[in-house]
Amino acid sequence: MQGAAAWLHANTEAGTMIFQLDWDDFPYLFFHNTQNAYLVGLDPTYLQLASPDLWNLWVSITQGRVEQPSGFILNTYGAPYVVGDRQHDAFADQAANDPNMQIVYLDQYSIIWRVNTSD
């Protein structure tokens, strides 16, 4: 996650919301990049209690149960980037079939997609 955090720091503006695929990636991301805002950090229960609908949608997206996830990620969560480790095959399959999801960073541990606006 260190490489992904460094890429985000170098290529995004301060305060940019980042949609991460696992809440437990937050400590690594935040340690290496404090300039961005992260959707879920420290404990996912905070989002679950504060906004059950957003929580349930986040879970569905991260588990690859939402087709064309870009619209929800950008319009519902305000996140122009998605970051995750390389173990989210179901989400990666959905992202690969979404014309508005573009891989902008990839290493052996992590992947970042840019969420493009619809044409």
Identify the role of each PLM range.
Residues 1-119:
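Extracytoplasmic
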